Amino acid sequence: MASLPKRIIKETEKLVSDPVPGITAEPHDDNLRYFQVTIEGPEQSPYEDGIFELELYLPDDYPMEAPKVRFLTKIYHPNIDRLGRICLDVLKTNWSPALQIRTVLLSIQALLASPNPNDPLANDVAEDWIKNEQGAKAKAREWTKLYAKKKPE
């Protein structure tokens, strides 16, 4: 960890020692800027029965540049496209060096709880969500069962 900036070391230590409920973020053994992340689907959301895998990468310019995050688990969500890219303001225009990895992960977890079809990345999913929200939520639940890891009982 010696070649990493102190900020990354501190954030990593805090993520491991004081994890966010429902979220794990483990640095990769070979590259400590790369994290394997899991996020549990929030209660009372179409994703509540699943655990989703993501990858998070801290660019060389971090914290001046936002982390790069994407879903590895296929998910039916208006703000996440087929490639796993996420439409989230804190990853784009609202990024600030004052924000941390845990803030980003909490924001992604909140996005699962409250999809926003009015600011979509997956236009087809957003259209479904707007036309028939209950049907879209049912499809999101179905995809969660098909593609996400099941939460332990």
Curated annotation (Swiss-Prot):
SMART domains, alphabetized: UBCc
Catalytic residues of the enzyme: C87
GO cellular component: cytoplasm; cytosol; fungal-type vacuole membrane; nucleus; ubiquitin conjugating enzyme complex
PROSITE patterns named among the record's database cross-references: UBC_1, UBC_2
Enzyme Commission designation: 2.3.2.23
Keywords of this entry: ATP-binding, Isopeptide bond, Nucleotide-binding, Transferase, Ubl conjugation, Ubl conjugation pathway
Entry GO MF terms: ATP binding; ubiquitin conjugating enzyme activity
GO biological process, one term: postreplication repair
Domain UBC core per the UniProt entry, residue ranges: 3-149
Protein's pathway: Protein modification; protein ubiquitination
Effect annotated for changing E55A: Strongly reduces MMS2 binding and interferes with error-free DNA repair
Cross-link type Glycyl lysine isopeptide (Lys-Gly) (interchain with G-Cter in ubiquitin), residue numbers: K92
Reaction(s) catalysed (UniProt annotation): S-ubiquitinyl-[E1 ubiquitin-activating enzyme]-L-cysteine + [E2 ubiquitin-conjugating enzyme]-L-cysteine = [E1 ubiquitin-activating enzyme]-L-cysteine + S-ubiquitinyl-[E2 ubiquitin-conjugating enzyme]-L-cysteine
First-level EC class: transferase
Record note on what altering A110R does: Lowers rate of ubiquitin chain elongation. No effect on thioester formation at the active site
Other noteworthy facts: Present with 8970 molecules/cell in log phase SD medium.
UniProt family annotation: Belongs to the ubiquitin-conjugating enzyme family.
Subunit structure: Heterodimer with MMS2.
Function: Has a role in the DNA error-free postreplication repair (PRR) pathway. The UBC13/MMS2 heterodimer catalyzes the synthesis of non-canonical poly-ubiquitin chains that are linked through 'Lys-63'.
Protein name: Ubiquitin-conjugating enzyme E2 13
Encoding gene per record: UBC13
